[in-house]
From Swiss-Prot:
Catalyzes the formation of the alpha-1,6-glucosidic linkages in glycogen by scission of a 1,4-alpha-linked oligosaccharide from growing alpha-1,4-glucan chains and the subsequent attachment of the oligosaccharide to the alpha-1,6 position. Pathway: Glycan biosynthesis; glycogen biosynthesis. It comes from Xanthomonas euvesicatoria pv. vesicatoria (strain 85-10) (Xanthomonas campestris pv. vesicatoria). One of its GO terms (cellular component) is cytosol. This is 1,4-alpha-glucan branching enzyme GlgB 1. InterPro entries: A-amylase/branching_C, Branching_enzy, GlgB, GlgB_N, GlgB_N_E_set_prok, Glyco_hydro_13_cat_dom, Glyco_hydro_13_N, Glyco_hydro_b. GO terms for biological process: glycogen biosynthetic process. The active site is at 411 (nucleophile), 464 (proton donor). Its EC number is 2.4.1.18. Monomer.
Amino acid sequence: MMSGVMTAVSNRWDPGAVRALAEARHGDAFAVLGAHPSDNGRFLRTYLPGADRVSAVLDDGQVVALDAGPEPGLFAGELPAHGGYRLRIGWPGGEQETADPYAFGPQLSDFDLHLISEGHHLQLADALGANVVEVDGVRGTRFAVWAPNASRVAVVGDFNSWDARRHPMRLRHQAGVWELFVPDVGPGAHYKYQLRGPHGHELPAKADPVARRAELAPGTASIVADPTPHQWSDDGWMATRARRQAHDAPMSIYEIHAGSWLREAGLDLDWDGLADRLIPYVADMGFTHVELMPVSEHPFGGSWGYQPLGLFAPTARFGTPDGFARFVDRCHREGIGVIVDWVPAHFPTDAHGLAHFDGTALYEHADPREGFHRDWNTLIYNHGRREVSGFLIASAMEFLQRYHVDGLRVDAVASMLYRDYSRNAGEWIPNIHGGRENYETIAFLRRLNEVVREHTPGAVMIAEESTAFPGVTADVAHGGLGFHYKWNMGWMHDTLHYAGLDPIYRRYHHGELTFSMVYAYSERFVLPISHDEVVHGKGSLLGRMPGDDWQRFANLRAYLGFMFTHPGRKLLFMGCEFGQPTEWNHDAGLPWHLLDDPRHRGVQTLVRDLNRLYVQYPALHAHDDDPSGFAWVVGDDAGNSVVAFLRKGKRGDAPVLVVINFTPVVQHGYRIGVPQGGQWREVFNSDAGIYGGSNLGNGGSVTAEQQSMHGHAQSLPLLLPPLGAIVLTPYG
């Protein structure tokens, strides 16, 4: 034993350091705690508030009792110059033996820190956050957080009674990262960071921005994630994904809110339960993809996920991160792609989140004219800061690489692109050239899309962008933003307004039906009938349709027929596929009982058949981005509210003729010019009895007559059903 060298221990404590440790203010705990060289070997200091006694257990088994210091919880003593040790701690409730967190050197490599500071660490959650690791044979968790302006950071959790005095962290100055390896802490541990700002003021405890797992709301703690990787079984899907998601492939997306698609006994399904029920349904309906409203962890369920704080953690509302991986895996095994809504524009002001994270505007702009979004009461990311843009890009890569997600739908792009978005004069700051474009965001989006294309080939990036900003889907090399697709908000607004008009007035708004083809090839588009169109007093898709009950259903069927044959990928929000009559309510499940009603079941059958038609006929998807794939046949018959157009595929693909009558008046002998003679099959009719229609049509086929019309030598005399869409294709 070395008790003889303990007489001078009380003189080894600096009063200022003792006070700073006791008040959880010391910014360099490693300078005080742990074992430091001394005249007699090493002098060990520990600070374990609440402990009754502490000993050092040396590698050779010798036990050195540490003397109590000048403050409760402080213990110190002399150790030999060499050799390891463990701490044996006596707590009021028992004894614990563990390694000393302050016996370990710096954890993150200089290269990691360089990548973090440059915003280029694509596996950011492998460096920052909470990672279960083994250091010098000791198992534990390495905590690391970016907080360059904090004067002190400690990790607090259920492993230290949430005591900010227990585990102050080490600052790695070159990157502004604080780190600490805490032995014996493993998966499932709850934790936060306790920070002091640059002037020493204590901040609210913060959740980990890079945590891979979070506590179920309303809890706000982060959780140490299980490091065991998911065992994927989707090799076949991943090998063919690039082909399945190519520009000339069909893409029909079913958008869902995971918490309200189906509820059992008033409760959300978990990821496994959702997979059990959703995947067979999506496959049966013929959708090629599901799109999940944001699954990143978010504090307020009423935001639907669009105000996230945990950009690396699938929300705990539906289970564990591995549960989410299992869901994606099972989708892939059934040939269904998974797109996730992702929010890099803004974040909520919750005290435990990113707001004023280290006592300064770290993730957000300091000036509210740049950093505060009044429409949503949220803070706006500073995309011009390397570490922030790198944080966001790493979040995107986390979902695309770790979870095999097939694409991201980037939310609120327009709000990022323009400095004056939703602001009046004097409420925004111009760019360096005096303009309204946000150059920093443009650079961020370009780099994001370049990184995705380089590191996750075959994944798609989709922009929700509601303005005419040029080149959203153009290549970055050609001055574009580099997205694969863009939501066609113009098509959606125009056609929904048209469809909501009484048919007697539609002749005066015919351009709303046809105008989309003027710009249809300026970008690569998705036609979105999303959740945004069935909330906030807009009513349901069915509820927008005019007329009596029969006409509303017929209008809806005709509108869906128009959507699925118009150039552009398809997106349909859950409930729209069976004509939900009320607005979507995120607190309730969909009204599935309505499928007992043949009218709603008919709409569902129609959408199922439209999906199969869309996939079966290349003319309906192969040339969505090529003007050669579309030709108006009748685009100017405003008086009858009739449109007709040809969709054309690649060489050898049969053309498809689409004719839609947007009035309740049956058109007999309506002649349409066609490019070839012979018989044309009626392969779809929205007025079919199986869909709930009146069963008026063309008896399954029509023979072309040698009567020129619309620039063609032959034409078809057609019966156009009321408020109906028909699709024909030549035999052979």
